[in-house]
Amino acid sequence: MVKKFTSKIKAAVFAAVVAATAIFGPAISSQAVTSVPYKWDNVVIGGGGGFMPGIVFNETEKDLIYARADIGGAYRWDPSTETWIPLLDHFQMDEYSYYGVESIATDPVDPNRVYIAAGMYTNDWLPNMGAILRSTDRGETWEKTILPFKMGGNMPGRSMGERLAIDPNDNRILYLGTRCGNGLWRSTDYGVTWSKVESFPNPGTYIYDPNFDYTKDIIGVVWVVFDKSSSTPGNPTKTIYVGVADKNESIYRSTDGGVTWKAVPGQPKGLLPHHGVLASNGMLYITYGDTCGPYDGNGKGQVWKFNTRTGEWIDITPIPYSSSDNRFCFAGLAVDRQNPDIIMVTSMNAWWPDEYIFRSTDGGATWKNIWEWGMYPERILHYEIDISAAPWLDWGTEKQLPEINPKLGWMIGDIEIDPFNSDRMMYVTGATIYGCDNLTDWDRGGKVKIEVKATGIEECAVLDLVSPPEGAPLVSAVGDLVGFVHDDLKVGPKKMHVPSYSSGTGIDYAELVPNFMALVAKADLYDVKKISFSYDGGRNWFQPPNEAPNSVGGGSVAVAADAKSVIWTPENASPAVTTDNGNSWKVCTNLGMGAVVASDRVNGKKFYAFYNGKFYISTDGGLTFTDTKAPQLPKSVNKIKAVPGKEGHVWLAAREGGLWRSTDGGYTFEKLSNVDTAHVVGFGKAAPGQDYMAIYITGKIDNVLGFFRSDDAGKTWVRINDDEHGYGAVDTAITGDPRVYGRVYIATNGRGIVYGEPASDEPVPTPPQVDKGLVGDLNGDNRINSTDLTLMKRYILKSIEDLPVEDDLWAADINGDGKINSTDYTYLKKYLLQAIPELPKK
């Protein structure tokens, strides 16, 4: 599938009522850097792995379903495989903001049309303005309209909605609810241009917390609902309802197609409307909460229905507002399109003993929860739950009654009933999408069979990766999910790293003892040590008795090549080293908070660090660091990586500062002039005929963003991704596979772990014809004589450390067993004595 923007360009018009509009094509690729074909896929974690704030069913075509992610783009359901297909993988690093999907709308008139309101943050964390993405082929290709304001796909209140809505009578018309006081916007040309609805009276007043940059903006206009019955096909819908994050007046109505607006009289006050659904019987159902979610949800909540035909408001809250058991927001809301009296609502973060999912078959007069209390601490469950598609959803822990594992979820900001199938239901959680296919069994006294419905969604924020030379091919550290051992790239792991931290932030292994690993993390519990060690390649972890001084956790970790020391650089403290697996720690001399540290992959005594614009080396296992006084360094460094098998070979990825390398342990560095930017750098198995590991980076070469590989120590590069596979933010970790040439693993911030392998039609590099000299010629004079025998003897006895030739192993390993020892000396001596006619052929 080709996911791209058309090359047509329109002038941006900033007028009083017309939004800036532009339709962009893909960036023009320079031909200076060669591209080679690669195939790309996700390393399967399974289950989603992140928060999916919304699910949208098309109301006129069966099985046309979309899901939106807060940092991972958007997906379309594939009914033939029952998996989700990612739709926005073409966005590169410079357009990462568009992986934050604020809202999604699927056209009920022309199901081929789908729209996305994209933009991740309203603050200054990312530079991009918001955008409306438009597709006429269900997300296969997209056009883009840039908006004159930002969207907040990963901001507070992101599960409220939907903010983007299509007029069901005249699908040229769309409405968009915005944040930050920007109000309500409208398009009359299929989303190409937009204008502010100046007559709309309330852009919202609610701010989650004005004291923090992330939470200080107005949540705004949060949903739009059309009353289809108020017009006829081909004519704009006259009656429109809009929900606003305002605790005084939150529900507004227009009866003249959006020309004028008034607050609906008699409406509830003091709460925020999370969702609004207008049923076919004229009832507008609304879920309310004290706060906007999705993390908090504590406080109070209500559920109301408004009879749009009589003007009557009816409180149908499952737990009375006055009750002490009413201690959470009501957020998710679903109405069965086959029966408007069947409704479902969810709690927003009740937490204990679990979430609440209520169902009513009489319009809210009575309710049933999906569980109820038995004899305390027992509970009676009206459901079964199957997590076989993502077994790690038990979080590796056991709960004490009345809690059980796995739970129903948390952050349940949206729930939907299939408009064509009353038995199918899906709902979102903070880690996956759950659902069932036998929902009506509940009404007959049966149990709902809940299962993971997120296959194909990979939305993890991955923070670090290692691919050791033995054991599992990949081990990860993952935000929110700690991390995993990935034994099979195509099958999700059965468990996450235990102990169960809140986020894994860094991982490393000992190059010469690869089963030894260290993991650093963040944790919600203060009594949990935020570093763990493993002696079996990450399958089991143990916590040390002590932590690095002054640490609150997180950060990065570097393990000595021989596993004898570990340096932890917490996010808030200076690096500290342990030589006894965390029993004791010592702050590393001459380094401070913010240092970037890595271990040499050959010499267990050596570590490297970049701190305050200087490069440092340690030769005593990380206890003390010394400034190498390397000249002309970049101002800052994102990652340091040392090359396995090459002592003293160090590479720096300095983002806009480029890519740097040293072959003398960091005393001198060379900036690679053929690399513009380098976010991360990693190494994998060398190409055939090469003795230097393949190098992988994400960055920019010849002004082209992408993923790149070098097989010749950085002399030349090839681009290994294409314009369909950008994956957004790819600046936390990259590593090649030391066992499979060409395979590379990349950590993304919202699209999980992606890996690439050469496509079948990529030519295998031809080994260069290099004259390494005669086998047995140890001094390079093109002769084999007694001088060479003497050199070999001295080398074996360690009276000399190096041979005069460039490749010691080639010249002196006579029998080709990978070692230089007495066997080779005997062969060479016999050859010189003419006891054998020739040396063994390698």
From Swiss-Prot:
Signal peptide: 1-32
Family matches, as Pfam families: Dockerin_1
Gene Ontology BP term (one): cellulose catabolic process
Superkingdom classification of source: Bacteria
Keywords: Carbohydrate metabolism, Cellulose degradation, Glycosidase, Hydrolase, Polysaccharide degradation, Repeat, Signal
MF terms in GO: hydrolase activity, hydrolyzing O-glycosyl compounds
Active site location: 70 (nucleophile), 480 (proton donor)
SUPFAM superfamilies for the chain: Oligoxyloglucan reducing end-specific cellobiohydrolase, Type I dockerin domain
EC number assigned by the record: 3.2.1.-
Domain Dockerin: 771-841
InterPro entries listed in its UniProt record: Dockerin_1_rpt, Dockerin_dom, Dockerin_dom_sf, EF_Hand_1_Ca_BS, WD40/YVTN_repeat-like_dom_sf, Xyloglucanase_GH74
Ranges: BNR repeats: 134-144, 185-196, 252-262, 358-368, 533-541, 577-586, 616-626, 660-671, 708-718
PANTHER family membership: OLIGOXYLOGLUCAN-REDUCING END-SPECIFIC XYLOGLUCANASE-RELATED, XYLOGLUCANASE (EUROFUNG)
UniProt record similarity statement: Belongs to the glycosyl hydrolase 74 family.
Known function: Hydrolyzes the glucosidic bonds of unbranched Glc residues in tamarind seed xyloglucan, producing XXXG, XLXG, XXLG and XLLG. Has low activity on carboxymethylcellulose, lichenan,hydroxyethylcellulose and glucuronoxylan, and no activity on xylan, polygalaturonic acid, wheat arabinoxylan, rhamnogalacturan, curdlan, laminarin, galactomannan, galactan, arabinan and pachyman or amorphous cellulose.
Name of the protein in its database record: Xyloglucanase Xgh74A
UniProt source species: Acetivibrio thermocellus (strain ATCC 27405 / DSM 1237 / JCM 9322 / NBRC 103400 / NCIMB 10682 / NRRL B-4536 / VPI 7372) (Clostridium thermocellum)
Gene: xghA
